[in-house]
Amino acid sequence: MNPYQVVKDFEQAVARYTGAPYCVAVNSCTAALMLAVAWHLQKRMPDGIRYKATWVFDTETRHTAGIIGQHAPLHEVNIPKRTYLSVPMSIIHAGGRPTFRDEEWLGMYQLEPLPVWDSARWFTTDLYGIAGMRQPSGPKGAMVCTSHHWSKTLGIQQGGCILHDDPEADAWLRRARFDGRTEGVAPKDDHITQVGWHCYMSPEVAAEGLVRLHFLPKHNAPLPNDEYPDLSQLEILR
């Protein structure tokens, strides 16, 4: 028996529940956002340019600076200034530069101008369709990132998902979450073509998610926002 089949079963169940064509499970919504942003940013780079951004804090100027190769620009990704701390950090780790806006949001918000949505505080049926209707460019290409942390609606140990509609992105995301590896192929037999991260969902977490999803109501209200600080005032993120 393949122990990772339960992860695929969980992904299929979440896709049905939310109305998403594809679902990629990872170990947190933070990781989901990072991978979704990374996918879109690398698609926006000129052919042949692949860069890594290194962020350093200059104690003299009191500013954070990005050091990148090949003079590649840092793409700005705009988010509400009051959200969870890991969101701008995910943007940085993905190679972008976070900027902030004033927005009173509930349930989900867009990481502008990317078609990426942070829905850590809302998990309900037809979630993917809801995000698509809110997206100014139309529903195509939306990536909705969910959280299944024990404090959230589904309430398993940890975990998150990327809901999307792109078969090319699906293959990339599955390798990206698993150290660049191909699912089901031993490292010695694999042909590694991309640098990945180590953020896949473990089978035991997926199994718990399947059980809880079976009993989850169809319609769930957004969770209230925490008392988030103003992230635009953090020097490390400026």
Model-derived regions, located:
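Conserved SAM-binding loop
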Residues: 25, 79-80, 162
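Active-site region of PLP-dependent enzymes
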Residues: 123-129, 140-238
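Conserved N-terminal alpha-helix of the aminotransferase class I/II PLP-enzyme fold
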Residues: 1-31, 39, 223-238
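PLP-dependent aminotransferase-like
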Residues: 38, 42-126
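Short alpha-helical
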Residues: 31, 85-86, 168
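Long, low-complexity intrinsically disordered regions
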Residues: 136-138
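Buried hydrophobic packing segments
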Residues: 32-40, 160, 209
